[in-house]
Amino acid sequence: MKVAAATRNPNKLRAIREAYRTFGFPAEVVPVDKPPGAPPQPIGLDAVAKWALERARHALAAAPGADHGVGIEAGVVEVAGYHLDITIAAIVDREGYVTVGTSPAFQIPTALLHDVLQGRELGATAEAHYGRPAVGYREGIIGLLTRGVVKRIDLNYAAVLMALTPRLPHNAPHYRKA
């Protein structure tokens, strides 16, 4: 199976490959550039989901031989007055069938929140605050906060696993293709 992913981030590419393999779908993951106009940090659940889906559709269109397009987008959501970072994965196939999954979410440190709510990417804000370059391509902010117990790849992997769940053969009868 050929899977196009709208990212060049090795962390996301590895998470996609591992999630597909976990469910028995051997996948060749092909990176493509992200779609134009993607915001540095989507804010709100709908915005995060929209850009995950935009990435998935863009990836599929950019790779004519691909069976699936995958988009992974992280962003900020507010829940009961708390701001959380969440990752959403969207998968689209050639028939237009879309499945979506999320990662666990974590509370964004208040020291970073102001800049993030002003539209600055959480990764860039964390890099400046913690003095750790390219954190988004490594352990992610969650890796810094948990001292490596949970890493960004874990969140990406979980989101892709959840997006793949409706596509498992035993689940197909329980989901309606849109």
Curated annotation (Swiss-Prot):
What's the cofactor? Mg(2+); Mn(2+)
Can you tell me where the transmembrane regions are?
none
Enumerate the catalysed reactions.
Answer: XTP + H2O = XDP + phosphate + H(+); ITP + H2O = IDP + phosphate + H(+)
Query: rRNA-binding: present as a keyword of the record?
Result: no
Keyword Transport found: no
One annotated GO molecular function is: metal ion binding
Q: Write down the InterPro entries for this protein, in alphabetical order.
A: ITPase-like_fam (IPR029001), Non_canon_purine_NTPase (IPR002786), NTPase/PRRC1 (IPR026533), YjjX_NTPase (IPR050299)
List UniProt keywords, sorted A-Z: Hydrolase, Magnesium, Manganese, Metal-binding, Nucleotide metabolism, Nucleotide-binding
Q: Which GO terms describe its biological process?
A: nucleotide metabolic process; thiamine metabolic process
Give a single Pfam family match.
NTPase_I-T
Q: What Enzyme Commission number(s) appear in the record?
A: 3.6.1.73
Q: How is the cofactor bound?
A: Binds 1 divalent metal cation per subunit; can use either Mg(2+) or Mn(2+).
Say what the protein does: Phosphatase that hydrolyzes non-canonical purine nucleotides such as XTP and ITP to their respective diphosphate derivatives. Probably excludes non-canonical purines from DNA/RNA precursor pool, thus preventing their incorporation into DNA/RNA and avoiding chromosomal lesions.
> Which HAMAP family is this protein grouped with?
Non_canon_purine_NTPase_YjjX (MF_00648)
Under the subunit heading, UniProt states:
Homodimer.
Q: Which family does it belong to?
A: Belongs to the YjjX NTPase family.
The molecule here is called: Probable inosine/xanthosine triphosphatase
